[in-house]
Amino acid sequence: MNFVPQLPRQVALILLLQFTNSLGVSALVPMMSFFIVEGLKAEPWQIGLYSGLVMPLTLAVNRWAGERLDNHFPVKRLLIVSVLAYITLSALLTQVTSLLILLVLIAPLMSLSNMGAGVVFTFGRLYAEQQGMDVARVNSWLRMMVSLAWMIGPAVSFSVVARFGFVSAFLSAFGIGIVYLTLWYIVIPSGFRSTRERRKTTGREPINWGLQIAGLTCLGFVITNSLFVSAMPLFFVHETGLPGATPGLSLSVKCLLEVFVIFGSVRLAERIGTRQVLMLAACLAAISMVLFAQVTALWQALAISVLEGVYYGLFAGVAISFVQSYAPDRPGRATAVYMNSLFLGGMIGSVSMGFIASATSFQTVLYTAAFSAVTALFVLIATLKVQPKAVDGSV
């Protein structure tokens, strides 16, 4: 971790901005299903109404934000939309008493809040380019901030709920929002925007198949992770009979390894190539899922969690740079494709897990997760000839 003192002040502030954004989002997003059932006393199936509304709105908003950034819209003016949406929804959640209000007010605000990470990722890339910095390394640092925040946010949020209630948790999120607003004001220069010139096209813009394939590859990894995380607690405790602390310990080991591997993934990519790193990650993902399906003891689960942390750290460290490389003159759109693959993959994994487990078993869910990783590997191999575009290439 000796890279921290070497960071320029502005880069360190951008990382802090991303950490604060992710901390705030992670403090609310995982808790919403729990709040719907326990706080609003709604039926569990009604969680799907909320998720089914937030997800498409988030995908659309991410795409919209990416287009604005690529069209030289000021980063600061765009990000304030996300910041204010987060602060407003945190305050409103302290007063929400019905599912209808949640769907009408909170869901749209949550989608606007969710676009913040993508905007900061694009901001970090644009700043790195304009300063002549290593873009892949800056991307990995930004992704590391997201992982660190998600290690902290949900745990703290659920702890506050358990001890003080939902209102206190939402007020804590509101406090994070105020810090987020302060950093927005300090970190982002008022006139900062993309300086890239886009190639002029006549008629309808052609489809960037390389970018779509890169996004599809990320989708396979995220579905693998989402299927496993959704099924893991019930598989370990109910189907396998492991101690109740196993899921939490396993996740802690995975997250710890993930953070360190993210930092090293860029160096590995410099040696063997980004696509090769993703191919290695896909192999490790498939192997770890199959091994998890065979565990019978706590030590086995923790040992395989090390492998899981390595695969996900490799993926997380290079994925955004891999996607952005297929649209170098459209970093906003590329980042939107990356972020949408995360949201969409998470939704597909969590929803399909329930259907698969109900029809078969949680062990089958893990085998399905392995299959998703193999699919990502197949896409990477089958598209070896689809190379990233040059900076001045067409979109």
Per-segment meaning from a language model:
Residues D329-A359:
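A late C-terminal transmembrane helix in Major Facilitator Superfamily
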Residues L49-E67, S252-G264:
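Central cavity-lining transmembrane alpha-helices of secondary-active solute carriers
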Residues F19, L100-G116, L219, Q300-L314:
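Hydrophobic core of transmembrane alpha-helices in multi-pass small-molecule transporters
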